[in-house]
Amino acid sequence: MKRLLLTIVCLLAVMVGASAQRLVIIHVNDTHSHLDPERTGEDVGHGGIIERAAYIDSVRNAVGKDKVLLLHAGDWNQGSPYYSIFGGDLEVSLINALKYDCLTLGNHEFDNGVEDLGRRVKGIKAPVVCANYDFSQFDMGRRGVKPCTIIRRGGLKIGIIGMLTDITKVVSYETASRIPRAGTDAEVVNKWADYLRNDKKCDLVIVLSHLGYDEDLDLVKETRGVDLVVGGHSHTFVKDLEYRTDLEGKQVPVIQDGCWGLNIGRIDVY
């Protein structure tokens, strides 16, 4: 498996001077129901759920489960016969088995409609976050999907905001027309970043995004209070962290892992 191993040193001001590793962020995106190793192409024999699980377990065993944050940036559904046959239920079982800490929605999560997605979301044990669409009229909004969440790992209080691509372009009209936006992308990120940073006193604020790589880069320039953007949707493999300057002049890193689970992102925070 190609593993994307990246290190962010002194990501937060409170960490400057710390010598011990505080946190490992493991992240994937756009796995698209690829549960088996690839059968063709240059990645033949690589990938698959077993290989991903083995790597995740190895990191947890090495640094301690309480120091690992496992994220998925959306589109865990659609892309192999497993989804066609089981309708996304198998992916939910595996998300729970791997013990993800947080996920955001991708557009392909809506392929069987918003009600069916709501049924599956309720089966996911980890928080599912999406801030730029309003699901309050649906059962999944009342009992499942929230704009953001707070997770404690490695002695840190971590706020995570979810973002979803423009569904009017990539989801059926029947579904997309029923789901109102909660504001512009920049508006909702600024709102929830302020809430997490100032009201909830989070040490680290992450945007878990399914907007696309270029959109993530642009988003940073219109927002404040965000420390890291973990992205998906465009299937972009980012070898090195790309930085953009936010409204306060801070350099914010943006990352994405390609697709199909062939790359696993790792960010070490000290």
Region roles according to the model:
Residues 2-9:
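Sec-dependent signal peptide recognition
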Residues 20-270:
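Acidic, metal/ion-coordinating pockets
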Residues 9-18:
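Hydrophobic h-region of N-terminal signal peptides that target proteins for export
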Residues 1-2, 19:
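Short linear, low-complexity motifs centered on an aromatic residue
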